[in-house]
Amino acid sequence: MPKWLIVLLAIASLAGVIVLEQTREPFPAVTPVMNTQAPTATPPATVPTVPQTASSAVGAPALPLPETTRPQTPSEIPSAPQTPSTAAAPSSVENPWAGLPLAEFLNRAAGELVRLSPETVTFLGLGTELGVRDDHLDPLTAEWEAEYYAIEQAIVDHLATYDLARETAEDRLNAEIYRASLASDLAGRSFTDNGYGVSSYMDSYPTYIEWFLTSLHPLETLENAEDYVARLAEIPARFRELEARLQQSEAIHAVPPRFMLEIAVEQLRATGSQPIEGSGLYATLRDALATIADATEETTRALLGSAEQVIADEVLPSYLELAEFVAAMAARANDDAGVWKQDSGADYYAYCLASQTTTDLSADEIYDLGLAEVERIQTEIRTAAATLGFDSALSMPELFGRLAEETGTSLGEDTIARCQALIDDIVPRVSSAFLRMPTQHLVVVDGGSDIYFSPGTLDGSRPGQFFAPTLVPQPIYGLPTVTYHEAVPGHGFQSAVAYEADIPPYIAGMSFTSFSEGWALYAERLAWEEGAYDENPYGNLGRLQDELFRAVRLVVDPGLHAKRWAYEQAVEYMVNNTGLDEPYVRSEVERYIVTPGQAVTYKVGMLRILDLRERAKAELGDTFSLPEFHDIVLGHGELPLDLLERLIDEYIAEHQG
């Protein structure tokens, strides 16, 4: 998929742990190894000029890939064309990394990549530290993408000059983690037009960019407000670049199903037709200016006037223009749901599975694993439900429908209060399972209709946040599991450990979905093992339903993309086998359509962590320590699963010795 979409997905999904310790040595200023200034974004003269490409700090998860595409060593990664603008520097005069110790090189190279993406700099809260203002959006051009890959290739080429066997174990591991992430990105160069830039799902670029500006762009100073208006002014140019990329994607049949494009058209038209006062882009700035201490009446009026003009004359019309472009695409589209319809669709899906799971599992293997897990978990659910008086012959929809009726629902502030109480209860329960309990602050906030965890910024100005759903009634039996998954001991806990661990910034910023989501699903089970459900058997059924939900994904994702399932077939299978309501399932299947491979990471990662734990238990017997095991898992930041397995094997060998 295009590099801009990888960055978009990583930021928008908030799946990666993007946290660095404030007291660490900052990324050093570096001289770019090549000229990477994109022609599409020219900062004002008063703003430091920065290269406008993407950052691997929030890139796609790492390899291994299937044997047909997986580079085994850095030397096997296809070399970038050796032109003056893309060639790795051949001499110390041209290569500022020459002669650097490994750790310093990695820190400098990673810092350079971070500063190349304005949106990533904002997400990490590194603008002040890097001397980069938050006044640009990442370009979406093929040129921007090519420059990014060239920088990444140069880093891989230089990394290959080090003899890792001579480095410390810590530096060697960090280099392997970083190389894995870069290798995954570079392997994706063959699929730069396969991703979906516009759809009805939340990762659609127009939806993402509004969310990014209204949720992540800092608005605490007048300079922040000026930067916000500058970014608003870039939206029309980004939409024109998006249209060019969509044309390239359509040429290889990389187009979402017609119905998803038709919904996207409605969304774009609604946004473009709204009055200024109803625009979230305008309201965000207006509300923020009311809280900025040095925002006088005059400056407020001037900034709002500028924003109003930009939104009315440029931004909203660009939404309407894009809507007509997408409407024409929809008229040419069909209803096929999977990426199998794309040119090289099978290879693209194999890449998605490998990069997302960091394993070499094939689509068929994942599908068969899913069928087996669905059968196993449904049997466990029926057994547990029978002890509560439920008929074991009930279907999943019937069983969980009755469970919801018996336990009731929560809404609004009640949901927030319940989630906070669950966190207060689980922290002391799981403390004995860890060597270190993080101190980073975590807050439960109003998530509207959404449920997710967002890491805090690097400067501590925004704490980790668990967004609890308040607008949609939530089955009470399911609240414990979602809280443990998103907060403690799941995403919030894992991200806080990474924040406080003594690991380099370029590692703390890595994102491997199979690790983070695998840990969060494992955390649900860990809460059960630590007694969180002992007095809440209904909640335990919610936990099992959640695990079943993730197992069903193992069937549906390859069903759609490898076995040519229709959209309705996927919806029907999921409703019948999870007991989840149909509207929610439809939104889930739409997600799987446009993010191939991501949905399988939860169960794949959880099963790998459990397998490694059982291996360590079997090998170490009475000397096995659960807190030590968890410290190995969490103490190095996010990892590709093959490297995690190696760490556990080394831990076992060390303790046996």
Task: Show where each model-derived region lies.
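Intrinsically disordered, low-complexity, compositionally biased regions/tails
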Residues: 8, 20, 49, 63, ...
